[in-house]
Structure formats: C-alpha cells, structure tokens
Amino acid sequence: LVPREASAERVEDIRWLNGALGPARDWDVFLDEGMPPLFSHFPRKRGLALFRAKAETIRAAHRQALQQTVGDPRYAVLLQAFTDWLDRRTWRDGLSEERRAKLAEPVLDFATPLLEHTHRRVVKRGESFAELSSEERHGLRIRIKELRYALDFCASLYPAAAAKSYLSALSSLQDCLGVMNDIVVTQRLLDEAGLRTASAARQVIEGWYGCRLAVHEQLFAELWRGFGQCSRPWQD
C-alpha cells in the first residue's frame, strides 16, 4: 500500500544507521554465539588465543563507531522523522485516490492474497534450496521473515491453532537460515581480521564452521518437510 517513493527517505536513513549497526552486530554474534564452543574445545591453541584478542579489538572499534553514529545529530533527526512519518501518517500524502481507497477496504481482502502470494514465493525458492548460493539463501530468509511478520500481524483474522503452527514452522526455518548466514559472514570477518588462509587458526575455524553449516543444511531439509505439512491458516 505504501509506494516505494514514499518510504525512500526513511529507507536511506535506516541504511545509514545499519552501516554502523551491522558490523557491530556481526562481531557480537561471532564472538558471543559462534566462537565460545570453539574456544572452549581448544583452550591451549595459541593461534586461536591471539586471534581472539585481535577480534575483541576489532569489535571494540565497531562498537565505538556505533556509539558515534548514535551520538550523531542525524540519528536524533532520524528517530523524530520516522516517528512523525508514522504518527502523522505523512506517508499517505503522495497516495493516489486508488491507493487511498484500498486503505478503507476490509483488511481480510488485502491480507489473504498477500499471504498467499508471499507463501508461493517462499515455496518456489525453498524447493531448490540445495542449488541456492549463499546470497540466494539469504534472500530466502528475508522472504520467510516477510511472510512470518505479515501473518503475525494478521494472525487474529485466521484460526488460532493453524496460525500458531504455521508461524512456528516459519520461525524455525528463519532461525536455521540465520545461523547459516552467520556462518557465511564468518569468512568476511576472518578476512577483516587479516587471518591468513594458510594459518592454523583459520583452518580450525573454517573446519568448525564447515561442520556447523553441514549440520544446519540437514536441519533445514527436515524443517522444510515439516513446513510443507503445515496448513495455510488463510485457507482453513
């Protein structure tokens, strides 16, 4: 319902913020969630200890950059502008009469076709999961997230049990793909840290994450089969 041009400025602001938020988040996930089991398993591996110290330094630098971003006047303007955009509904200013008329339609008439369309996009991409590149898998995760949020917003319109089961399946798929995406991001973080391909520490890390990726690829296949057995709540 909201034209892209109506949200273009807001999207640009969020991209600016994410430029600082994204790297800080990536290093937090890597050091707080991904690496602790590896550090515990190899407590005496000197190369890993040295890498950990350097990684913490890099994380601290990204956190400082994020603090500077949040302290930038643009951040305060961003928050106020976004709040006004929602509260005052200024996003409606440029809508055509046809789009304005759609806002008055019953939400069920809008939600059901949207959910069905998004579901089909997810299924089309997910059926060929094994052939997808890492970028395409990330795109699938975004589609699943869109479908999950859309249904979560409209869940009260449909049978509760079916909606709960479907949302649970989507959440599991999203989490599994999220871990796989974090594993892919690891390569970029190792490059950023200057860890040489031939170094023992990098080989240990890549081997560890390679095993995690294989496990989650198998898990995704199981979760996908379960998702395929879920009834679509908007069809009940």
Region spans (language model):
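Function-determining surface determinants
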Residues: 1-236
